[in-house]
Amino acid sequence: METYFFADLCPEGSFELSEEESKHVVKVRRHQPGDRVRIANGLGLLADCELTEIRSSRATLRVLHSIQHAWPEPRIHLAVSPLHHEDRWEWLLEKATELGVYRISPVLCERTEHYRWKLPRYSRIFESALKHSLRTHLPILDQPMPLSQFQAESNAVTYVAHCDESADARTPRISLDLMDCSRNTCLMIGPEGDFHPSEIQRLVDNGAIPLSLGALRLRTETAVIAGLSRFLGGSMQRAGAALLTLLLTALLTMPMY
């Protein structure tokens, strides 16, 4: 059963889908009155609905059954530097949503490159990823903020992934398999070129746990997937399988440079 998005979904009653979603239901999927579809509101409410009417290419549906889902625990908060290349940034947001990230905080670091902020487009990306992955919740997206502000406001267990080997002399990085996936966690990924050494030191001094994603140097969006996949199944074997599946399915859509 296909999943569609309707932000104002209620647990019962009838409603009319947006013009865009109606077009997908009627003209793309060619549903007819009497067909059943699934509707999500991005806040945990999921409803099985019956298509009751099609008028002027707008679809009216009636809720047959609904259930309110709580956000799955543990929650993962992603703090990541925005990317200069818009398509790579949007790809990152899409895959983070598919992997079930709870919150995304764009943090502005010393090496963050110029970026553009397109919130309405990001909302559409989140909705599409939610429907595709059959998830029930949209991630929270914060406005971009300086790293110092994020550091002052964050109180979760934080892992900062970096590749500065010189910092290991003071506080060695732990490997992915040593991450604690049993509680709410924040994962920090820096910009292209990594965090500045002084930023790493401030984060570690403030309680962040330095993390290694392996011997290879990864682009920001790849590092995000590698880190988030650790939380998907709670074990490296399941996380690795999930990461492999995601990378294979995304290969044709990932922007290449």
Regions found by a protein language model. Give the residues of each.
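N-terminal positively charged helical leader segments and presequences
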Residues: M1-H69, P120, L244, L251-Y257
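RNA substrate-binding interface of SAM-dependent RNA methyltransferases
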Residues: Q68-V160
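Residue-level signal for inorganic ion chemistry
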Residues: G34, A96, F126, L203, ...
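A generic structural signal for short beta-strands and their flanking turns/coil linkers
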Residues: G13, P33-D35, L45-A47, S57-A59, ...
